Amino acid sequence: MFAPLLKKLFGSKNEREVKRMLKTVSIVNAFEEKMVALSDEQLRGKTAEFKERLAKGETLDQLLPEAFAVAREAGKRVMGMRHFDVQLIGGMTLHEGMIAEMRTGEGKTLVGTLAVYLNALSGKGVHVVTVNDYLARRDANWMRPLYEFLGLSVGIVSAFQPPEEKRAAYASDITYGTNNEFGFDYLRDNMAFSQEEKFQRELNFAVIDEVDSILIDEARTPLIISGQAEDSSKLYIEINRLIPRLTQHIEEVEGQVTQEGHFTIDEKSRQVELNEAGHQFIEEMLTQAGLLAEGESLYSAHNLGLLTHVYAGLRAHKLFHRNVEYIVQDGQVLLIDEHTGRTMPGRRLSEGLHQAIEAKENLNIQAESQTLASTTFQNYFRLYTKLSGMTGTADTEAFEFQSIYALNVMVIPPNKPLARKDFNDLVYLTADEKYAAIIADIKESMTKGRPILVGTATIETSEHMSNLLKKEGIDHKVLNAKYHEKEAEIIAQAGAPGALTIATNMAGRGTDILLGGNWEAEVAALENPSAEQIAQIKADWQKRHQQVIEAGGLHVIASERHESRRIDNQLRGRSGRQGDPGSSRFYLSLEDSLMRIFASDRVKNFMKALGMQSGEAIEHRMVTNAIEKAQRKVEGRNFDIRKQLLEYDDVANEQRKVIYHMRNSLLAAENIGDTIVEFRQEVLDATISQHIPPQSLPEQWDVAGLEASLASDFAMKLPIQQWLDEDDHLYEETLREKLLNEITTAYTEKEDQAGIEALRTFEKQILLRVLDDLWKDHLSTMDHLRHGIHLRGYAQKNPKQEYKRESFSLFQELLESIKRDTIRVLSHVQVRREDPIEEEARLRREAEELASRMQFQHAAAPGLESEQLSEEGAEVAVAAAPVRNDQKLGRNEPCWCGSGKKFKHCHGQIE
């Protein structure tokens, strides 16, 4: 009730923050005259002075005004660009660990230099994170002269970079790279076998460009390093032949069945479900195909894998469409990012869905993979001591940024007021009427000489629009994932008078559409242009620029609304940069997916009440409100999905932290002998307690079982029954001591044979390998648990609580298994002295072989419906490690040593 009054009296929180920062801006401006008077050498020397002051106890906050003044002056001298006052506010926002929302063309890249320079003074490193390699290289090379002028080093990390080059990049004061590469390097570091192999330092401060894209759109995408699993390509092909025989079951709203079928599709949640008839029919077909035994059920425990394949095939055929969710290029299925319209090379759908699409498209089916290490962007970026970001559209997601990342959003005032006109949406009954209206708008704008950008949600729509324009004889350019290599060229001239560009959502995030076209691109196209040619190109551009401004600037036409208001705002933001004139209009129809699924009934009834005729449009605030309400509903649902996924992943994340801390401690330790002694004692105690329960009577002892366990776990054949027969005073405690002495003596003899130093090195290698192998199996077990945990809801149990409880139990088992398996391998192994040079060369060869056989990919985000985790088709960023195969014994065969373990878990790890 009082909120509007208080806001009027004191201003919004954002306005109060801006006022607070303006006081600091005044202090920065007061330093300007002093900085102008400094020579280049003196200005450069300020960096060393700041570092010295930090070492003496000053804080970065105390240095901020003077450091910003230094960065501003350096920008003027090196780049020819002076930071505006509002850009200083943006820099302060980033330094304070917030998200700066700045409109298109307000100079986000330049804003970043202020916070990056200030925080790099600490010497702990700053990471500048971008969405792709092109932007990382462009921004790093663009700003490198500024940072190097100020005495700071700049590095770029990228995929397939030589290890030494990558380590040097991470050791730099400022490191540029993509979110994927930073995340993968974190996982690689936690699979390293020595400190020297690691890349990253402690994660200090990150500035994320297009932060909404990375922390919101990519939040559900796990980063995974994986190894190859067994080949199931024949099964995918067989099931792909059966799926087209299934038909969809359709019901009207009143519950009237209009088509009997085998499965239902829920478009809102993007789920497909087999009904009873569908289950029966698919089981019959699988039995006829010889894939399911006669009388067997798909729901039998040993057939659940087959059921997963059936659902993957069904989703591939019914939910994933060519040129909408993916394209086929060079014999590969390339996924399309729904938020940007760009292809995502290397990214694959999980749970067999990608293979099912490959089978559908008659392509070569790539092998499935097994997870070796994983994390999510949500959990990776929360590891930084301080996090900040920049984007043109964050305010609509402010609640999510705050609740998940503890990041506040600051809307930075524009340097010049916005002059763009955003017209109300026009809604038509059919898509054909909508396209006819768009073409009429295009023709009208072209006669005025205005550049036009038509935004579409899919490649399919962009190509349909292009075909309509060809029929009308209208010249245009198409920009979508199929023609992404021409992106820079098309965007450069999209602002020329009368230029018409049809684009998916990829339309130039990170690039500006300049009114009149881009004169710099014209100059770059010439070989050794003369000063006269450059001057002429500039003069011609100035005329075109003025012509476009007088015509009304860039006109943005959207062919439909996206599920997210943020994506719509990004498209609008292409027009009206830095106070330029412009306009935007959204054209919709009741046949659009958003309208059909979420908003159609109310709007359709409203249009019927008005008695609308074919070709007529409705332009009313009620309609716009209904659409925005539908978008908020979708955004809220997607937020719930991301939040719920995070709650589940947080469980795995806590375990990941423990394992990675254990691993890093091992790598850092010179000697793990004491750890092995502790492990040996704990494993022995547990083994004895299993067969001789504490405070039990001798009649209850399982001596034969204890002898067998000691032979299996410690490679010790000890005559315990004989000892007991010969010594009446050998009780439980004295027996424990005797066994420990025997086992310790045997291991000491091993030390004497191999040499203490060699054995300590060997112990570390074995413990690391056992830990990695068991962690990999644990991840797989956790994955299976997560897939089926929603079923606990039917037993009136809370799936999240059950998941936490069972995960904890599994983790306890993992920690015990690490100890037990390490001791088992070390006890069974036969050691010999090895020449130190030979040993080092062997370890190096193994490390190089491991590195050369690793591969990386990305997998799609799982969707959640209420408590159900549906991770079929989850997108993943994945890196695959080698699978070792022994020539004599299969990895899954029993080990020759008689331990009862599989060869891969025993001597297969060290031979």
From Swiss-Prot:
GO biological process: intracellular protein transmembrane transport; protein import; protein targeting; protein transport by the Sec complex
Record-listed E.C. numbers: 7.4.2.8
Cofactor(s) annotated in UniProt: Zn(2+)
Keywords, sorted A to Z: ATP-binding, Cell inner membrane, Cell membrane, Cytoplasm, Membrane, Metal-binding, Nucleotide-binding, Protein transport, Translocase, Translocation, Transport, Zinc
Residues bound to Zn(2+): C895, C897, C906, H907
One GO cellular component, as annotated: cell envelope Sec protein transport complex
Spans through the membrane: none
Gene3D superfamilies the record matches: Helical scaffold and wing domains of SecA, P-loop containing nucleotide triphosphate hydrolases, SecA, preprotein cross-linking domain
GO terms of molecular function: ATP binding; metal ion binding; protein-exporting ATPase activity
Membrane topology, as annotated: Peripheral membrane protein
Catalysed reactions, as listed in the record: ATP + H2O + cellular proteinSide 1 = ADP + phosphate + cellular proteinSide 2
InterPro entries in the cross-refs: Helicase_ATP-bd, Helicase_C-like, P-loop_NTPase, SEC_C_motif, SecA, SecA_DEAD, SecA_motor_DEAD, SecA_preprotein_X-link_dom
Keyword Translocase annotated: yes
Classification via SMART domains: SecA_DEAD (SM00957), SecA_PP_bind (SM00958)
Cellular localisation: Cell inner membrane; Cytoplasm
Pfam family, one: P-loop_SecA
Function summary: Part of the Sec protein translocase complex. Interacts with the SecYEG preprotein conducting channel. Has a central role in coupling the hydrolysis of ATP to the transfer of proteins into and across the cell membrane, serving both as a receptor for the preprotein-SecB complex and as an ATP-driven molecular motor driving the stepwise translocation of polypeptide chains across the membrane.
Family: Belongs to the SecA family.
Quaternary organization: Monomer and homodimer. Part of the essential Sec protein translocation apparatus which comprises SecA, SecYEG and auxiliary proteins SecDF-YajC and YidC.
UniProt protein name: Protein translocase subunit SecA
